[in-house]
Structures are given as C-alpha cells and as structure tokens.
Amino acid sequence: TILGTGSAFVTRCYNTCFIIDCGVSRLMVDAGGGNGILTQLEKAGVAIADVGHLFLTHAHTDHVIGAVWVARAVVNAVKKQAYDGALHIYGHKRVIDVLTEICRLTFSKKDFGIFQERTVIDVLTDGCQRKIAGMDMTFFSIHSTKEEQYGFRAVTPEGKTVVCLGDEPLNDANRDVAQNADWLLTEAFCLHSEAERYKPYEKHHSTALDAGKTAATLHARNLIIYHTEDDSLPSRQKAYAAEAALNFSGHIVVPDDLDSVTL
C-alpha cells in the first residue's frame, strides 16, 4: 500500500512512504513528515498494532518525522495493552540516532521509557542482509552526497524481487544490486519537460524520463514512480507514465496516495 507519493513540500498529497505486506507481517518504509501518517494509516485500514517493522531510508524531515508519530502511536497502544511484541526499527546509524534523539527530547520520560522497552533497534550497514516480514532483504548505501541514505533489494516469499532506490537517482555503484528487479521503485520529482521550472537536478532528484531510462538500463520488469511534485496530481499518472514509456517498455505505475499494488 502506497501511503504517500509526494516530495518534501507537498500539501495536496502525503510525503512518500509505503507498506509492504507479504502476509507474514507488515514492513513500513519511511513515514513522511508529520502526524499525517496516522491519517494515512487509518485511511488505508492499517492499525498501528499491525505495523511490526519500520525501515527508515534517511533522516530528512519528510521521511523521519512521521516515524516519531509512529513510535508515539506504538507507545500509546502499549499503554492501552493494544500492541503485542516490539516495533522493529531498521536504519543506518545516523537516522536511528536522529529518530531516537527526537523521541527522547519530545516524549515524556515515561513514554520514552516505553519506547526503549518496546522497540528493537537494528543499525544497518552497507550490504547487510536481514529477514524481515517474510522477505530476504539486502540494504545498500545509495552513496548520496547530500544525506546518508540506504535503499534495499527484497525478495518476497513468492520470489518477486523489489528494489527501492531511495529518493535520489541511481548511483552506478549500485547497478549490480539493482539489476533485474520485478519491481523497481524510484523517484521522479517532475516531468523532464518541466525540469526548467522545478530544477530537480539541483535537489539531487530526477524526472519521469530519467526514471524510464533507469528502469530500462536495469532491465526491470515493472516500474513504480513516486516522490513527485503535487501541482499536477489530476494529470500526473498519465503524463509521468507517458514520459517514462519513451525509454521503458515495461509496466509503469504512477500511484496516487493509498493505492495498492500487487507485487
């Protein structure tokens, strides 16, 4: 389920984040930039008690601040005896440190104690592997020069391969780990035809045209495009897919918030 599809400063949709549900448990990837994540979960019919795993790609506000609210919601559920087990949180050291420090500074002493007791923190390193929510996952640094960030390659119980490149263009260092995905998830800040207006490259982002090129060079079978501007929502699906299709002949999905994609 795609909880949000927008870039940092969107107001007409939520920031990019999603949940992968393989029937074992649910993995949330990022949480957007505020307590709107609670609204998105409610609209998607996902109870906080059903979120057992959370992976954070990096510590930018539009990805990590929503995680503070997820953590607080878990604490609240624990106090109501409505959350079993622990919330498993994954990320590289910096993003884990940022999340933990914000929670320490903003939670009551009692709530932060519950947070510490009922979370399992897993600090990831480049190339490490984990079994999470039924998936075999390999995490990798995207080699960002802006903010340390990780993506992943996951294999579902059904054998489908999902590659998430984070919210920056592909770095050639990750070409091998990103090859031949059944589903490639990549950002596109805007259409290439509107690059002069939005200046995506200055923000370490790319365009729908670039997303199509990336999917083609990586031999992906399906492409999901997200982390976009929100000025073109009524026409976004058609326009972005058409531009990406100039270079990519596979299946292209440009989801709206709360859309579900069957992997």
Language-model segments: residues:
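Short histidine/acidic/glycine/proline-rich micro-motifs that form metal-
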Residues: 6-8, 89, 95-96, 228-233
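Conserved beta-strand hairpin/beta-sheet module of binuclear metal-dependent hydrolase folds
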Residues: 1-44, 148-166
